[in-house]
Amino acid sequence: MSLEEEILWAEKYRPRSLDDIVNQKDIVERLKRFVKDKNMPHLLFSGPPGTGKTTAALALVHDLYGDNYRQYFLELNASDERGIDVIRNKVKEFARTVAGGNVPFKVVLLDEADNMTADAQQALRRTMELYTETTRFILACNYLSKIIEPIQSRTALFRFYPLKKEDVVARLAYIAKNEKVEYDQKALETIYDITQGDMRKAINILQASSVYGKVTVEAVYKVLGLAQPKEIREMIMLALQGNFLKAREKLRELLVNYGLSGEDIIKQIHREVTGNEINIPDDLKVLLVDYIGEVEYRIMEGADDEIQLNALLAKLAVYGEKYLKGK
Protein backbone atom coordinates (compact mmCIF):
# COMPACT_ATOMS: atom_id res chain seq x y z
CA MET A 1 0.00 0.00 0.00
CA SER A 2 1.42 3.41 -0.97
CA LEU A 3 1.87 6.27 1.48
CA GLU A 4 -0.87 8.20 -0.32
CA GLU A 5 -3.31 5.32 0.13
CA GLU A 6 -2.56 5.25 3.86
CA ILE A 7 -3.46 8.92 4.34
CA LEU A 8 -6.80 9.52 5.99
CA TRP A 9 -9.17 11.09 3.50
CA ALA A 10 -10.30 13.55 6.16
CA GLU A 11 -6.75 14.97 6.12
CA LYS A 12 -6.15 14.52 2.39
CA TYR A 13 -9.26 16.55 1.54
CA ARG A 14 -8.99 19.11 4.34
CA PRO A 15 -9.18 22.62 2.81
CA ARG A 16 -5.77 24.33 2.94
CA SER A 17 -6.98 27.89 2.33
CA LEU A 18 -10.03 29.89 3.36
CA ASP A 19 -10.93 30.03 -0.35
CA ASP A 20 -11.32 26.22 -0.34
CA ILE A 21 -13.89 26.17 2.49
CA VAL A 22 -17.37 25.86 0.96
CA ASN A 23 -19.45 26.08 4.13
CA GLN A 24 -19.60 28.40 7.17
CA LYS A 25 -19.58 31.27 4.66
CA ASP A 26 -20.16 34.11 7.15
CA ILE A 27 -17.27 32.93 9.30
CA VAL A 28 -14.98 32.56 6.30
CA GLU A 29 -15.72 36.11 5.13
CA ARG A 30 -14.87 37.52 8.56
CA LEU A 31 -11.63 35.54 8.70
CA LYS A 32 -10.65 36.73 5.23
CA ARG A 33 -10.86 40.31 6.47
CA PHE A 34 -8.32 39.46 9.19
CA VAL A 35 -5.98 38.11 6.50
CA LYS A 36 -6.41 41.24 4.39
CA ASP A 37 -5.73 43.55 7.36
CA LYS A 38 -2.93 41.31 8.71
CA ASN A 39 -4.42 41.84 12.13
CA MET A 40 -6.91 40.01 14.33
CA PRO A 41 -8.07 39.67 17.94
CA HIS A 42 -7.91 36.50 20.01
CA LEU A 43 -10.52 34.10 18.58
CA LEU A 44 -12.88 31.57 20.16
CA PHE A 45 -14.32 28.93 17.80
CA SER A 46 -17.29 27.09 19.30
CA GLY A 47 -19.40 24.30 17.81
CA PRO A 48 -19.98 20.55 17.48
CA PRO A 49 -17.19 18.18 16.35
CA GLY A 50 -16.47 18.01 12.63
CA THR A 51 -17.93 21.41 11.73
CA GLY A 52 -14.64 22.94 10.57
CA LYS A 53 -13.17 24.71 13.60
CA THR A 54 -9.66 23.30 13.29
CA THR A 55 -9.79 23.47 9.50
CA ALA A 56 -10.74 27.16 9.61
CA ALA A 57 -7.91 27.90 12.05
CA LEU A 58 -5.32 26.09 9.91
CA ALA A 59 -6.58 27.76 6.73
CA LEU A 60 -6.44 31.16 8.43
CA VAL A 61 -2.80 30.82 9.49
CA HIS A 62 -1.87 29.37 6.08
CA ASP A 63 -3.38 32.41 4.35
CA LEU A 64 -1.69 34.77 6.82
CA TYR A 65 1.85 33.37 6.57
CA GLY A 66 1.94 31.26 3.41
CA ASP A 67 3.48 27.81 3.05
CA ASN A 68 5.99 28.41 5.86
CA TYR A 69 3.25 29.09 8.40
CA ARG A 70 4.48 26.36 10.77
CA GLN A 71 7.32 28.52 12.11
CA TYR A 72 4.79 31.14 13.23
CA PHE A 73 2.20 28.70 14.53
CA LEU A 74 1.87 26.45 17.58
CA GLU A 75 -0.91 23.85 17.69
CA LEU A 76 -1.79 22.05 20.92
CA ASN A 77 -4.61 19.65 21.72
CA ALA A 78 -5.87 20.58 25.17
CA SER A 79 -7.39 17.09 25.61
CA ASP A 80 -3.86 15.69 25.83
CA GLU A 81 -2.19 18.67 27.47
CA ARG A 82 -4.68 20.27 29.79
CA GLY A 83 -2.62 21.45 32.78
CA ILE A 84 -0.95 24.65 33.91
CA ASP A 85 2.53 23.35 33.03
CA VAL A 86 1.68 23.42 29.32
CA ILE A 87 0.67 27.07 29.59
CA ARG A 88 3.73 27.95 31.67
CA ASN A 89 6.18 26.12 29.45
CA LYS A 90 5.18 25.43 25.83
CA VAL A 91 2.83 28.36 25.28
CA LYS A 92 4.90 30.99 27.14
CA GLU A 93 8.12 29.86 25.45
CA PHE A 94 6.51 30.22 22.04
CA ALA A 95 4.60 33.43 22.80
CA ARG A 96 7.48 35.46 24.22
CA THR A 97 9.48 35.59 20.95
CA VAL A 98 8.65 38.19 18.32
CA ALA A 99 7.39 37.11 14.90
CA GLY A 100 9.29 38.13 11.79
CA GLY A 101 7.86 38.84 8.36
CA ASN A 102 4.84 40.86 7.26
CA VAL A 103 2.52 39.73 10.06
CA PRO A 104 3.49 41.24 13.43
CA PHE A 105 2.29 38.33 15.58
CA LYS A 106 2.36 34.55 15.88
CA VAL A 107 -0.64 32.28 16.44
CA VAL A 108 -1.33 29.62 19.07
CA LEU A 109 -4.20 27.19 18.44
CA LEU A 110 -5.56 25.40 21.50
CA ASP A 111 -7.87 22.70 20.16
CA GLU A 112 -10.54 21.21 22.47
CA ALA A 113 -9.86 24.05 24.91
CA ASP A 114 -13.00 23.17 26.87
CA ASN A 115 -11.06 20.17 28.24
CA MET A 116 -8.56 22.43 29.99
CA THR A 117 -8.82 22.66 33.76
CA ALA A 118 -10.16 25.89 35.25
CA ASP A 119 -6.72 26.67 36.69
CA ALA A 120 -5.08 26.14 33.30
CA GLN A 121 -7.64 28.47 31.71
CA GLN A 122 -6.85 31.13 34.31
CA ALA A 123 -3.15 30.75 33.53
CA LEU A 124 -3.98 31.01 29.83
CA ARG A 125 -5.94 34.22 30.43
CA ARG A 126 -2.90 35.81 32.08
CA THR A 127 -0.64 34.62 29.25
CA MET A 128 -3.01 36.07 26.65
CA GLU A 129 -2.85 39.45 28.38
CA LEU A 130 0.93 39.37 28.86
CA TYR A 131 1.86 38.47 25.27
CA THR A 132 -0.90 40.20 23.31
CA GLU A 133 1.69 42.27 21.41
CA THR A 134 3.43 39.22 19.96
CA THR A 135 0.82 36.44 19.90
CA ARG A 136 -2.81 35.80 19.02
CA PHE A 137 -4.67 32.84 20.47
CA ILE A 138 -7.33 30.74 18.74
CA LEU A 139 -9.31 28.53 21.11
CA ALA A 140 -11.52 25.80 19.63
CA CYS A 141 -14.15 24.15 21.83
CA ASN A 142 -17.24 21.94 21.58
CA TYR A 143 -18.94 23.43 24.65
CA LEU A 144 -18.77 27.18 25.12
CA SER A 145 -20.13 26.89 28.67
CA LYS A 146 -16.89 25.15 29.73
CA ILE A 147 -14.76 28.17 28.81
CA ILE A 148 -14.36 30.59 31.72
CA GLU A 149 -15.98 34.00 31.30
CA PRO A 150 -12.71 35.99 31.53
CA ILE A 151 -11.47 34.19 28.39
CA GLN A 152 -14.80 34.56 26.60
CA SER A 153 -14.74 38.32 27.22
CA ARG A 154 -11.22 38.59 25.74
CA THR A 155 -11.96 36.78 22.49
CA ALA A 156 -14.07 37.28 19.37
CA LEU A 157 -16.63 34.46 19.28
CA PHE A 158 -17.31 32.45 16.12
CA ARG A 159 -20.14 29.90 16.31
CA PHE A 160 -19.82 26.92 13.97
CA TYR A 161 -23.00 25.04 13.11
CA PRO A 162 -23.55 21.47 11.85
CA LEU A 163 -23.10 21.30 8.09
CA LYS A 164 -26.11 21.06 5.80
CA LYS A 165 -27.05 17.71 4.32
CA GLU A 166 -26.56 18.82 0.72
CA ASP A 167 -23.06 20.16 1.50
CA VAL A 168 -21.93 16.97 3.24
CA VAL A 169 -23.40 14.63 0.61
CA ALA A 170 -21.88 16.70 -2.21
CA ARG A 171 -18.46 16.61 -0.54
CA LEU A 172 -18.68 12.84 -0.01
CA ALA A 173 -19.65 12.34 -3.66
CA TYR A 174 -16.70 14.50 -4.78
CA ILE A 175 -14.26 12.50 -2.65
CA ALA A 176 -15.67 9.14 -3.79
CA LYS A 177 -15.38 10.13 -7.46
CA ASN A 178 -11.86 11.46 -6.94
CA GLU A 179 -10.86 8.18 -5.25
CA LYS A 180 -12.61 6.20 -8.01
CA VAL A 181 -14.95 4.55 -5.50
CA GLU A 182 -18.43 3.46 -6.57
CA TYR A 183 -21.29 4.51 -4.30
CA ASP A 184 -25.05 4.57 -3.92
CA GLN A 185 -26.57 8.00 -3.35
CA LYS A 186 -28.68 6.52 -0.55
CA ALA A 187 -25.50 5.39 1.20
CA LEU A 188 -24.11 8.94 1.24
CA GLU A 189 -27.41 10.21 2.64
CA THR A 190 -27.29 7.48 5.28
CA ILE A 191 -23.80 8.58 6.29
CA TYR A 192 -25.13 12.11 6.80
CA ASP A 193 -28.12 10.86 8.81
CA ILE A 194 -25.74 9.01 11.12
CA THR A 195 -23.16 11.79 11.48
CA GLN A 196 -25.57 14.76 11.56
CA GLY A 197 -23.27 17.37 10.03
CA ASP A 198 -19.94 16.08 11.37
CA MET A 199 -17.88 16.21 8.17
CA ARG A 200 -14.77 14.56 9.60
CA LYS A 201 -16.74 11.57 10.88
CA ALA A 202 -18.67 11.34 7.59
CA ILE A 203 -15.47 11.20 5.53
CA ASN A 204 -13.96 8.58 7.84
CA ILE A 205 -17.06 6.38 7.44
CA LEU A 206 -16.92 6.83 3.66
CA GLN A 207 -13.27 5.72 3.59
CA ALA A 208 -13.92 2.73 5.85
CA SER A 209 -16.92 1.66 3.75
CA SER A 210 -14.92 1.87 0.52
CA VAL A 211 -13.06 -1.36 1.40
CA TYR A 212 -16.16 -3.26 0.26
CA GLY A 213 -15.58 -2.05 -3.31
CA LYS A 214 -18.83 -0.09 -3.43
CA VAL A 215 -20.24 2.18 -0.73
CA THR A 216 -23.76 0.91 -0.03
CA VAL A 217 -26.15 1.33 2.87
CA GLU A 218 -25.31 -2.22 3.94
CA ALA A 219 -21.58 -1.49 3.86
CA VAL A 220 -22.03 1.65 5.97
CA TYR A 221 -23.93 -0.18 8.70
CA LYS A 222 -21.49 -3.09 8.57
CA VAL A 223 -18.53 -0.75 9.11
CA LEU A 224 -20.25 0.92 12.05
CA GLY A 225 -21.29 -2.38 13.60
CA LEU A 226 -24.93 -1.27 13.65
CA ALA A 227 -28.07 -3.23 12.83
CA GLN A 228 -29.69 -2.76 9.45
CA PRO A 229 -32.51 -0.18 9.72
CA LYS A 230 -35.03 -2.66 8.30
CA GLU A 231 -34.31 -5.03 11.21
CA ILE A 232 -34.91 -2.26 13.74
CA ARG A 233 -38.15 -1.32 11.95
CA GLU A 234 -39.25 -4.97 11.96
CA MET A 235 -38.76 -5.16 15.73
CA ILE A 236 -40.64 -1.90 16.30
CA MET A 237 -43.58 -2.97 14.14
CA LEU A 238 -43.80 -6.40 15.80
CA ALA A 239 -44.14 -4.66 19.16
CA LEU A 240 -46.64 -2.06 17.91
CA GLN A 241 -48.76 -4.85 16.42
CA GLY A 242 -48.91 -6.52 19.83
CA ASN A 243 -46.50 -9.34 19.07
CA PHE A 244 -44.30 -8.68 22.10
CA LEU A 245 -42.70 -12.14 22.27
CA LYS A 246 -41.49 -12.04 18.65
CA ALA A 247 -40.29 -8.46 19.13
CA ARG A 248 -38.31 -9.60 22.17
CA GLU A 249 -36.79 -12.45 20.16
CA LYS A 250 -35.75 -9.95 17.50
CA LEU A 251 -34.18 -7.72 20.16
CA ARG A 252 -32.21 -10.66 21.54
CA GLU A 253 -31.06 -11.52 18.03
CA LEU A 254 -29.81 -7.96 17.50
CA LEU A 255 -27.97 -7.91 20.81
CA VAL A 256 -26.24 -11.23 20.08
CA ASN A 257 -25.59 -10.97 16.32
CA TYR A 258 -24.33 -7.39 16.27
CA GLY A 259 -22.96 -7.12 19.79
CA LEU A 260 -24.83 -3.84 20.19
CA SER A 261 -25.12 -1.98 23.46
CA GLY A 262 -28.47 -0.78 24.77
CA GLU A 263 -27.42 2.78 23.94
CA ASP A 264 -26.69 1.80 20.31
CA ILE A 265 -30.10 0.16 19.89
CA ILE A 266 -32.03 2.95 21.59
CA LYS A 267 -30.45 5.51 19.25
CA GLN A 268 -31.39 3.40 16.22
CA ILE A 269 -34.95 2.99 17.52
CA HIS A 270 -35.17 6.77 17.99
CA ARG A 271 -33.91 7.36 14.44
CA GLU A 272 -36.51 5.01 12.96
CA VAL A 273 -39.43 6.32 15.06
CA THR A 274 -38.68 9.93 14.10
CA GLY A 275 -38.01 9.07 10.44
CA ASN A 276 -40.41 8.59 7.55
CA GLU A 277 -40.18 4.83 7.00
CA ILE A 278 -42.60 3.88 9.81
CA ASN A 279 -46.13 5.14 9.22
CA ILE A 280 -47.55 6.02 12.64
CA PRO A 281 -49.61 9.03 13.83
CA ASP A 282 -47.73 12.10 15.04
CA ASP A 283 -49.34 11.98 18.50
CA LEU A 284 -48.03 8.42 18.91
CA LYS A 285 -44.57 9.52 17.74
CA VAL A 286 -44.53 12.16 20.48
CA LEU A 287 -45.34 9.59 23.16
CA LEU A 288 -42.76 7.14 21.83
CA VAL A 289 -39.98 9.74 21.65
CA ASP A 290 -40.74 10.80 25.22
CA TYR A 291 -40.57 7.23 26.51
CA ILE A 292 -37.48 6.41 24.44
CA GLY A 293 -35.79 9.35 26.16
CA GLU A 294 -36.70 7.93 29.57
CA VAL A 295 -35.29 4.52 28.68
CA GLU A 296 -32.07 6.02 27.31
CA TYR A 297 -31.62 7.99 30.53
CA ARG A 298 -32.05 4.85 32.65
CA ILE A 299 -29.56 2.92 30.52
CA MET A 300 -26.98 5.71 30.76
CA GLU A 301 -27.49 5.76 34.53
CA GLY A 302 -26.49 2.10 34.69
CA ALA A 303 -29.76 0.16 34.44
CA ASP A 304 -29.69 -3.25 32.72
CA ASP A 305 -29.81 -2.74 28.93
CA GLU A 306 -31.96 -5.74 28.04
CA ILE A 307 -34.51 -5.20 30.81
CA GLN A 308 -34.96 -1.56 29.80
CA LEU A 309 -35.30 -2.40 26.11
CA ASN A 310 -37.84 -5.12 26.92
CA ALA A 311 -39.79 -2.53 28.91
CA LEU A 312 -39.70 -0.26 25.86
CA LEU A 313 -41.06 -3.02 23.61
CA ALA A 314 -43.83 -3.70 26.13
CA LYS A 315 -44.72 0.00 26.10
CA LEU A 316 -44.77 -0.05 22.30
CA ALA A 317 -47.24 -2.96 22.44
CA VAL A 318 -49.50 -1.02 24.84
CA TYR A 319 -49.37 2.13 22.71
CA GLY A 320 -49.95 0.12 19.53
CA GLU A 321 -53.09 -1.44 21.02
CA LYS A 322 -54.41 2.00 21.91
CA TYR A 323 -53.46 4.02 18.82
CA LEU A 324 -53.22 1.53 15.95
CA LYS A 325 -56.02 -0.93 16.68
CA GLY A 326 -58.18 -1.38 13.61
CA LYS A 327 -55.71 0.38 11.29
Curated annotation (Swiss-Prot):
Binding-site residues for ATP, renumbered to this chain: G47, P48, P49, G50, T51, G52, K53, T54
Organism superkingdom: Archaea
Protein name in UniProt: Replication factor C small subunit
Subunit record text: Heteromultimer composed of small subunits (RfcS) and large subunits (RfcL).
GO biological process: DNA repair; DNA-templated DNA replication
Entry function: Part of the RFC clamp loader complex which loads the PCNA sliding clamp onto DNA.
Family: Belongs to the activator 1 small subunits family. RfcS subfamily.
